[in-house]
Amino acid sequence: MFETLIPRFPDYELIDSGDFEKLERFGRYVVRRPEPQAIWRRTLSEEEWRRTADAAFLRDARSDERGVWRLKPQTPDRWTVGYDHAGMHLRMRMGLTSFKHVGIFPEQAANWNFIYDNCVRMRAEGRTPKVLNLFAYTGGATLAARAAGADTTHVDSVKQVVT
């Protein structure tokens, strides 16, 4: 039997991956985007991927990193998803970027839980946690710390976020 340590995240699902792409659900919307680490064959057919995806990232022929999103009608380019853990209730804004990102990194959920749980423990011990989140990017870890009552400082300087 194969076990994973992935936290419960009802607003996220990895539907399929392979052939250097991944098909993911964030809330009610399914996105198709490049994934260089998905070196295996996908399970679902190309037709199923096309039919399922509400948004698909198309790479710019002149750039390995940039591209555009093709959206089905009625698919927004921004929406929110929720994430809950042990009293932490996060609402995070999804946003489709020109460099294939969507606004969060769901694989970081275990880290959000760790940060939240440790900040809650520190507060229970009478200490005020102080969190300096460098390279903070989308902010999931900062939100988790703040939700637990930590004093937080969120810093990032990735060019696409600053400009």
Question: Where do the protein language model's features map onto the residues?
Answer:
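Non-catalytic substrate-recognition/targeting regions of SAM-dependent transferases
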Residues: 10-24, 31-106, 113-116
